[in-house]
């Protein structure tokens, strides 16, 4: 019954980065219970759920993506969680806003893929559509703006903006 009720999640997850890592033997990769819990499972619409809009970044994604040990071990960007947390969107989430972008808004929740994958929500060819989910009328120029910006990378050379970094 669980598999039938969650068939859409399982189908998306099958080709996602975490599932691919598990199939390669990486037992530290996220599974359903890492995000949803084991016993006290709540819908993502429940504000007390770890996977709710206001909690997902800190209580789910941040558990692994803020870990220097895990990001270094698996060759992941070590600053992604911190740069999101320090961004306009991250500050809004930390301030308690629920109608704001979180990790799943851009990366998806069950279909997380590398930005190099043409089917990824964060692949360059898909950014206008991804950003347009919240920013109606988003253009290609809008979509090249960086969300993960740090003082070290806010030089304007790659679409990052030192001014936006300072504002956030």
Positions of PLM-derived features:
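Inter-heme linker and motif-flanking segments adjacent to c-type heme-binding CXXCH motifs
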Residues: 1-165
């Amino acid at each position: 019954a669980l598999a039938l009720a969650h068939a859409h999640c399982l189908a998306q997850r099958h080709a996602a980065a975490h599932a691919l890592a598990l199939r390669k033997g990486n037992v530290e990769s996220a599974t359903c219970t890492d995000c949803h819990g084991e016993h006290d499972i709540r819908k993502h619409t429940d504000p007390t759920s770890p996977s709710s809009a206001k909690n997902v970044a800190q209580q789910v994604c941040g558990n692994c993506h803020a870990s220097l040990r895990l990001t270094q071990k698996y060759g992941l960007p070590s600053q992604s969680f911190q740069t999101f947390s320090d961004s306009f969107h991250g500050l809004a989430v930390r301030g308690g806003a629920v109608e704001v972008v979180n990790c799943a808004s851009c990366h998806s929740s069950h279909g997380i893929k590398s930005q190099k994958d043409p089917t990824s929500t964060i692949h360059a060819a898909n950014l206008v559509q991804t950003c347009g989910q919240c920013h109606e009328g988003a253009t290609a120029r809008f979509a090249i703006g960086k969300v993960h910006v740090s003082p070290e990378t806010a030089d304007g050379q790659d679409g990052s903006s030192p001014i936006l970094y300072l504002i956030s």
